[in-house]
Amino acid sequence: MYSAGLNNYIRFANGKGFGNLHNHMQIMDVEIPVADKHIVVNNTWRRSSIIKMQSIESAGYRCEINQKHETFTAKNTGKPYMEGHHALPMKLQDKFINSLDVYANVICLCPTCHRLLHYGVESEKKNVIDKIYYDRADRLAVCGIKIGKKEFESLIK
C-alpha cells in the first residue's frame, strides 16, 4: 500500500530521477537553518608546491595525456590552466620507503584528464593509466620507486 511512496522517497534520497524535474525544483527553494560546524582532522603527507609547479612548467603547460587538450587561461600564470597529479597518490606513501613527492611521480594534466583519473569509470581510465605507467616507470625506478605494471594498476584504482 505504501510501496510507491517509499520507492519515490528512496529515489529522492538517492538523488535519482531529478533530470526531468528541473521545472519543479523551485518547490524546494525554502529557507534552511545553517547546520552546526564540526571539526574534521585529517593527516596528509606534505606535498611540494615547487615540484608541482615545476612539473607543470616543464610540460610546457600541456596535458601529458594528450597535448592537444585545451583549457582556459589561468589568471595567476597567464598560461593554460593545468593541474599537477601524483601518479602514485601520496596517500600510499606508507607503502614506499622513498618519497612519492618527486618529479617523476607528478604529471601535468588538463582538468578533464585529472577528473577522469579521480572520478572516471575504469574502462575509460585504462588507456590513460597505461600511458602514465609506460611514460613514468623508468623515471620512478631511478627515484627508488620500483613498481610493476600490475601493482601500479592495483594501487591507483
Per-segment meaning from a language model:
Residues M1-A13:
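Non-catalytic DNA-binding core/recognition domains of DNA-processing enzymes
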Residues R11-N14, Q67, T71, H118:
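Hydrophobic/aromatic-lined pockets within catalytic cores
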Residues A13-K16, R62:
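Short secondary-structure junctions and interdomain/linker hinges
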Residues K79-G84, L88-K157:
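A detector for short metal-coordination/catalytic motifs
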Residues L6, H38-I39, G84:
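Generic structural hydrophobic/aromatic packing signal, biased to beta-strands
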